[in-house]
Amino acid sequence: MTKTKIMGILNVTPDSFSDGGKFNNVESAINRVKAMIDEGVDIIDVGGVSTRPGHEMVSLEEEMNRVLPVVEAIVGFDVKISVDTFRSEVAEACLKLGVDMINDQWAGLYDHRMFQIVAKYDAEIILMHNGNGNRDEPVVEEMLTSLLAQAHQAKIAGIPSNKIWLDPGIGFAKTRNEEAEVMARLDELVATEYPVLLATSRKRFTKEMMGYDTTPVERDEVTAATTAYGIMKGVRAVRVHNVELNAKLAKGIDFLKENENARHNLS
């Protein structure tokens, strides 16, 4: 049975929109990783730079100081480790420590050395759709054009197709209607040759699905609804804060999809 991968978020920042300050020391980060492993996580995604609206950019030195001690402490655990960074210097330092994957929210557009570094260490990379919100074509067409162009550049740099993931970038450089359009047409991204990661956890999109004001934690059940929807559309992984809830849901949806496919094959 094909298993949807659960990527658990580990923000080692003081200011992330959902859990800033909770895991920004090594001991608390280790405890959270152990808990996520018990809850069924497949990948831990360590991030040292907040992406919340209005966040301040941190220096390279500060990002290194936040991320490296935590990565060094958890890289020996029996779980795949990803680092959420758009800086090749941070990526290389973490890859040297043994991480498996780089999650680049700028898809190699911020730092053109990123692909060469990831290829050098034979690692995986996630390319997320981003931008300034100004576009000359409809959002899905622009997203597909941009991501496929960057995936092509990644392959030229030496990263094989099966190690390149695409993320539609819900919550980044898109209006509410554009996010809804991207979600409705996820299957078009899935139809590419690349595995797709969906990352909606606790974001504005899930708040707007509910139709009233909520705290980030109160959006977990609606996040799980997007997980179910994404899996039915064909995404291969989801990036979430609440690992236990989404791991259980994904297991159930995976079973139902496998059951449906098996019965169709019999007919």
UniProtKB/Swiss-Prot annotation:
Catalytic reaction list: (7,8-dihydropterin-6-yl)methyl diphosphate + 4-aminobenzoate = 7,8-dihydropteroate + diphosphate
Assembly description: Homodimer.
Cofactors: Mg(2+)
Gene Ontology MF, one: dihydropteroate synthase activity
Protein name: Dihydropteroate synthase
Pathway recorded for this protein: Cofactor biosynthesis; tetrahydrofolate biosynthesis; 7,8-dihydrofolate from 2-amino-4-hydroxy-6-hydroxymethyl-7,8-dihydropteridine diphosphate and 4-aminobenzoate: step 1/2
Recorded superkingdom: Bacteria
Annotated EC: 2.5.1.15
Residue sites binding Mg(2+) per the record: 11
GO biological process, one term: tetrahydrofolate biosynthetic process
Keywords: Folate biosynthesis, Magnesium, Metal-binding, Transferase
Gene: folP
Organism, scientific name: Staphylococcus aureus (strain MSSA476)
Biological role stated in the UniProt entry: Catalyzes the condensation of para-aminobenzoate (pABA) with 6-hydroxymethyl-7,8-dihydropterin diphosphate (DHPt-PP) to form 7,8-dihydropteroate (H2Pte), the immediate precursor of folate derivatives.
Binding site for (7,8-dihydropterin-6-yl)methyl diphosphate: 51, 84, 103, 167, 203, 239-241
Gene Ontology CC entries for this record: cytosol
Alphabetized InterPro entries for the sequence: DHP_synth-like, DHP_synth_dom, Dihydropteroate_synth-like_sf, Pterin-binding_dom
Domain Pterin-binding: 1-251
Protein family (similarity comment): Belongs to the DHPS family.
